[in-house]
């Protein structure tokens, strides 16, 4: 199973991520997003950052997760290569919205500060959006699709 693939959207760029678990989808979407920004094979694991996000739906959590990673890139220049989920809570096993449930994810992101002399600049991603957003389970595979503003 492939981990992610870019989606060609007129005027924007999208990403489709896959996983055997919802955690894997979050990891693969983040790595896929980083690969749209630069060649992640050139990223070294020189430092790590901790990310924690909590929202009231799986869709909100997914978009907020990616936007938090974009924030760390835009603000601090940090670009990730490897992600370890430290904890996650997705309410019940259903991916339907339940306003009383909490959806959380905490992870350690390993990477380094972006260096334009060593790292290729591909796309400047401004934000993950809700446009055509999908997070779902199809048979035994979790999938997520997201469109980015560039």
Walk through the language-model features, giving the residues of each.
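Intrinsically disordered, low-complexity regions
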Residues: 1-150
């Amino acid at each position: 199973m492939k981990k992610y693939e870019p989606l060609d959207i007129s005027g924007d760029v999208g990403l489709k991520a896959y996983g055997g678990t919802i955690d894997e989808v979050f990891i693969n979407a983040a790595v896929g997003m980083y690969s749209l920004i630069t060649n992640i094979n050139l990223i070294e694991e020189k430092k790590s950052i901790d990310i924690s996000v909590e929202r009231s739906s799986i869709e909100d959590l997914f978009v907020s997760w990616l936007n938090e990673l974009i924030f760390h890139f835009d603000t601090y220049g940090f670009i990730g290569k490897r992600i370890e989920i430290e904890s996650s809570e997705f309410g019940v096993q259903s991916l339907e919205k339940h306003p009383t449930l909490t959806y959380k994810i905490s992870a350690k992101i390993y990477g380094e500060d972006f260096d334009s002399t060593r790292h290729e600049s591909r796309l400047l991603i401004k934000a993950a959006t809700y446009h055509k957003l999908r997070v779902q389970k199809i048979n035994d595979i979790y999938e997520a699709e997201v469109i980015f503003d560039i």
